[in-house]
């Protein structure tokens, strides 16, 4: 996730909460990343010019994890807005393909976590903990 440093406005980002039963998938951002290094984050990335957010999400999951997800039919699960980026977070619980770390230049690990594991993680955004805990409780 690259953050805008010019006056072009906030970068538009899509991310996914991937669920597998009572586990959620997180990606560990490499320590050398300029923005949000060495933290656990949701998979996703930029919405390209003219691209629908749902299409962006499907593309990003293919690029980062090697999976094919259906476009979400529901509205975003959560949104984070800052002066530098606007992030839409979508719930994904069905996909095809074998999940791998296909973006090793961005993430040095991908892993599944249960609710009890989340509190000890350095997460990219403070709202992730309550959001993920609530999702896993349902």
Residue ranges and their predicted role:
Residues 47, 118-119:
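A generic structural signal for short hydrophobic patches within well-formed alpha-helices
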Residues 69, 78-100, 109-111, 115-117, ...:
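Active-site-adjacent beta-strand/loop module that shapes the phosphate/pyrophosphate-binding cleft
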Residues 2-25:
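Conserved N-terminal beta-strand and adjoining loop/helix that marks the start
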Residues 65-71:
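Short secondary-structure junctions
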């Amino acid at each position: 996730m690259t953050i805008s440093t010019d006056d072009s406005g906030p970068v538009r980002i899509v991310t996914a909460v991937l669920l597998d039963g009572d586990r959620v998938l997180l990606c560990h951002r490499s320590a050398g990343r300029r923005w949000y290094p060495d933290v656990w984050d949701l998979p996703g990335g930029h919405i390209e010019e003219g691209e629908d957010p749902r299409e962006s999400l499907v593309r990003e999951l293919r690029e980062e994890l090697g999976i094919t997800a259906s476009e979400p039919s529901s509205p975003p699960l959560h949104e984070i807005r800052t002066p530098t980026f606007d992030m839409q977070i979508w719930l994904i619980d069905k996909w095809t393909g074998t999940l791998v770390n296909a973006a090793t230049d961005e993430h040095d690990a991908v892993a599944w976590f249960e609710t009890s594991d989340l509190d000890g993680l350095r997460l990219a955004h403070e709202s992730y903990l309550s959001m993920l805990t609530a999702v896993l409780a349902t």
